[in-house]
């Protein structure tokens, strides 16, 4: 019988706003924080036996450029014998890291893994390419925070290089997602986060971060700072379309540009017993799919269908559905295609990325983490986690409470 992969612990930083509380922390230092928290919460683990660290990171042009997973392990104080590798499936990187770690354990090639993701969009650098020829006076500078750079002309000709908000407007147009429905979706995200925060539902998954001050004691940062739980429909309706006044995607019904890191401790049953760990969830399976880049936000729909077919499970069996809210338009296009109601209580019951934020390489790991704790709070069995990915992909993963 093949071994199973169990999530034994999962923890994340609070998510910071662009230029906010976490913006003063180097990306590699940020990546180390949840690993340090895992080490502190699990003192019985022999950390020398961790087979690998797999981290997702979408940028990798700045302080995250030299294999940030390896950097994170060293900076966290793990033994030098513990290796690390960084994955890049853009927005899906963190989820891909978790699924890949689980696959290694299921294959019998590893017994104890750390997986997660990091992104500091605040600290994403500007980059400049070399000139095509000597003494050329041409130059270009790209902001690597999000979106296209170093554009391939053939890619542009064949598929277009629409910005992320443009792809969301493409989805809204193609699937006829009304502005009012997008704003209502965004409002639910904010309100559900507000209720979850008030009930203390994020305490188990968030590791407070100490922020050094110029004078006095460090500031303790322990709450996501992107949410706006007092948002109203009237306020959302006043916002202008990002891509033009006649279009429907706005700053209010889109996810944020954010900073954060997340790490999960994943083990086989035997390793969990050896290290005194209590399995919390089983990694059931993961699947990916491709769609046209111009409607990249629709990617979760085929990924979810592929995953359900692969596992023999149904949407009706899912007790929690964590759908990354890159944009309300794409979220609604996906849920409607899957036959789900817009206000299905299983979808992002504690709010989603429109409220919480979307640090690209971290978000997938955050979805799995949040889903796991929600299953334990409610006694549910299965959770489906899924997200869209730039350049036209989707990823989905199912976990089971144990």
Residue ranges and their predicted role:
Residues 1-72, 76, 167-179, 189, ...:
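Conserved active-site "lid/cap" helical segment
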Residues 25, 57-112, 145-148, 158-164, ...:
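Conserved catalytic cysteine-centered active-site region
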Residues 112-170:
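Flexible glycine-/small-residue-enriched beta->alpha junction loops
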Residues 1-27, 146, 232-298, 302, ...:
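Condensing-enzyme catalytic core mediating Claisen C-C bond formation in acyl metabolism
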Residues 12-13, 24, 28-33, 44, ...:
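N-terminal extracellular/periplasmic Venus flytrap/periplasmic-binding protein-like
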Residues 87-119, 172-201, 263-270, 335-336, ...:
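Active-site-proximal alpha-helical scaffold in enzymes
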Residues 55, 169, 202-205, 213, ...:
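Active-site pocket-lining segment
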């Amino acid at each position: 019988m093949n071994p199973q992969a169990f999530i034994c612990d999962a923890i994340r930083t609070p998510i910071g706003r662009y230029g906010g509380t976490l913006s003063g922390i180097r990306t590699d230092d940020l990546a180390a924080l949840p690993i340090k928290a895992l080490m502190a919460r699990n003192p019985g683990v022999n950390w020398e036996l961790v087979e690998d660290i797999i981290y997702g990171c979408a940028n990798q042009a700045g302080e995250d450029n030299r294999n940030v997973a390896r950097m994170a392990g060293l900076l966290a104080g793990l033994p030098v014998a513990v290796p690390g590798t960084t994955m890049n499936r853009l927005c899906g990187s963190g989820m891909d890291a978790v699924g890949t770690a689980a696959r290694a354990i299921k294959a019998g090639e590893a017994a104890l893994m750390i997986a997660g993701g990091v992104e500091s969009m605040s600290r994403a650098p500007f980059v400049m390419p070399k000139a095509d020829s000597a003494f050329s006076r041409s130059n270009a500078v790209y902001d690597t925070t999000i979106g296209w750079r170093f554009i391939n002309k053939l890619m542009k000709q064949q598929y277009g290089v629409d910005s992320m908000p443009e792809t969301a407007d493409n989805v809204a147009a193609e699937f006829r997602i009304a502005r009012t429905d997008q704003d209502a979706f965004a409002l639910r995200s904010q309100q559900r986060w507000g209720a979850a925060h008030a009930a203390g539902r994020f305490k188990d998954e968030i590791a407070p971060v100490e922020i050094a001050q110029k004078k006095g004691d460090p500031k303790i940062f322990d709450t996501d700072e992107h949410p706006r739980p007092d948002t109203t429909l009237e306020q959302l309706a006043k916002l202008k379309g990002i891509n033009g006044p006649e279009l429907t995607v706005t700053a209010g019904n889109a996810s944020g540009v954010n900073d954060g890191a997340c790490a999960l401790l994943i083990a086989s049953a035997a390793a969990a017993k050896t290290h005194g760990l209590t399995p919390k969830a089983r990694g059931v399976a993961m699947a990916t799919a491709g769609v046209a880049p111009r409607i990249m936000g629709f990617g979760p729909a085929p990924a979810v269908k592929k995953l359900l077919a692969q596992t023999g499970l149904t949407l009706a069996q899912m007790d929690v559905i964590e759908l990354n809210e890159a944009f309300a338009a794409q979220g609604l296009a996906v849920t409607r295609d899957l036959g789900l109601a817009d206000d299905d209580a299983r979808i992002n019951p504690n709010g989603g990325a429109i409220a919480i934020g979307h640090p690209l390489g971290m978000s997938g790991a955050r979805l799995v983490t949040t889903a796991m704790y929600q299953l334990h709070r409610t006694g549910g069995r299965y959770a489906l986690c899924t997200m869209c990915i730039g350049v036209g992909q989707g990823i989905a993963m199912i976990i089971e409470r144990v």
